[in-house]
Regions:
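Hydrophobic alpha-helical and helix-loop surface patches within well-folded domains
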Residues: 1-104
Length: 104
């Protein structure tokens, strides 16, 4: 959960379990990066109304992906930086195909 000036996480998100898989570790890193990016975009700056919520969430996701490709200890766990972007784009395209989506 992010707030202006503070981000809180549960212990299990920050301290990896011994039996934790690399996929779970990656997901934990993704959540941390996403929530930390909200401190700058989404908390310090915010939308006027709920219609524009997609903007702060998409920017937080973009920052998450960019951070994961720029930090050597994280990026080294992936074959190449494009893998992260392609997985991100694939998720966005699949979400856009749903009947519940609408033009922005």
């Amino acid at each position: 959960m992010e707030n202006v000036g503070a981000v809180t996480f549960t212990d299990r998100l920050l301290v990896p379990a011994d039996e934790q898989t690399s996929a779970i570790t990656r997901r934990h890193i993704e959540v941390q990066m996403h929530e930390l990016s909200h401190m700058w975009f989404g908390d310090l700056t915010t939308m006027k109304w709920w219609n524009d919520l997609w903007l702060k969430e998409s920017f937080a996701d973009f920052c998450r992906v960019t951070a994961m490709t720029e930090i050597p200890s994280i990026a080294s766990k992936y074959p190449n930086s494009e893998t992260i972007y392609l997985q991100f784009m694939d998720g966005a395209i699949n979400a856009d195909l749903k009947p519940s989506t609408h033009p922005i």
